[in-house]
Every structure is written in structure tokens, then in C-alpha cells.
Amino acid sequence: MCGRYTLSNPNEILAELASGDDGSPLAARYNVAPRQIAPVVVADEDGSRQVVSMRWGLIPNWTKDPDNSLPAINARAETVAEKALFRESLRRRRCVVAADGFYEWYREGRQKTPMR
């Protein structure tokens, strides 16, 4: 499961996904990591899609110290609806994370190389 993703052409991708994109230019991102803020697409109450910024990761509402907790960044499609951590978000709080690549860091000694 990958812990980094890329969004190399955010303006084109988000304009295609969201009718409410305000047109503000966004810079390409090649190393989006957990806990970083990135653009996503959400549906408003009337169903129109809007681009908003959200922090990557899901911290359970039962966490005692959210500021020092590691967020969940992966879920298995075959069990996501059964897990307490994801169940309510899957039903009521969905979003589209615009990405055009994902990768993990491959480590060899002290050197790290991104592997797609």
C-alpha cells in the first residue's frame, strides 16, 4: 500500500472533476505525504462538486490525542465497509482525491528512491 502520491497537473484534473473550481492556479505536487493538505473534490448539499483542501489521513473520533496520532491512510476495498474506522465516512463523507501517480520510497542503505 502506497504512502505517497503525485498530482502533476492539478488545474486540468480538478477542472474536469469539479464544476465549482474557482480557477485559482495550483502547483504540481510530486510528494504528497500523509498529514499534508491537498486538494480534493466534495459534493455540496445540492450535489455540485467543489474543490476544497483537506489533510490526508483519517484519525478515529475515539482517539484521545489526535495531534499525536498517526492517521489511517489505507483501507482494503474488500473490508472497508466492515471496519469501524471507515464505516461512517464511507456512508456519509466521501471525497475524490485527485492523483495521477502513487509510490513508496525504496530504501537501500541511506539512499531512498521513489518506486511507482
Where are these regions (language model features)?
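Short linear sequence motif anchored by a di-proline
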Residues: 1-116
